[in-house]
Structures are given as C-alpha cells and as structure tokens.
C-alpha cells in the first residue's frame, strides 16, 4: 500500500512538473495543478473513500483547458520515455 501511495504522489508531482514546464502556461494554471496534491489519496486504485473538501475545492479551481492539457501531457509520457502507450479502456 505504501508503494501505491508513493506512485500516486509521483504521478501528482509529474502533473505539477508538466504544468510548470509547459511554455506559455500561466502561473494560475500551475498553481491550481499544484493544489491537486491534496487529492493524492483519492487517485489510488481501491480507494473507495470520498475526496476531501480541500481536494474538491482544488479541482473546482482548475481551468478546464489547463486540466485537459495536463492530462494530455501525462498521456504522452510513455512515448517520450520510449515505452508502449497505455490503454485504459474501461
């Protein structure tokens, strides 16, 4: 379970770094993505608990375009690391 928490934290750090390193990205977007670190416990597989109000508030503060672009950046990471694409079909 500790390794899953570490993985979730690493993913959120990557989110933050991706948002911060993107040219032309506003500071508001970077700060909002950084606030999503409070959602770390809720992105682990098997977590059935409700997110905290702090997490929900941070998510509400993120601009839709900023969130989508950050997700797209994360989706491209395997390709940039010479890894196969991840297919998360439901």
From Swiss-Prot:
One of its GO terms (cellular component) is extracellular region. InterPro entries: Bifun_inhib/LTP/seed_sf, Bifunc_inhib/LTP/seed_store. Keywords: Disulfide bond, Secreted, Signal. Disulfide bonds join 29-66, 39-55, 56-81, 68-88. Its main location: secreted. Residues 1-26 form the signal peptide. It is found in: Secreted. Belongs to the A9/FIL1 family. This is Protein LIM1. It comes from Lilium longiflorum (Trumpet lily). The lineage of its organism: Eukaryota, Viridiplantae, Streptophyta, Embryophyta, Tracheophyta.
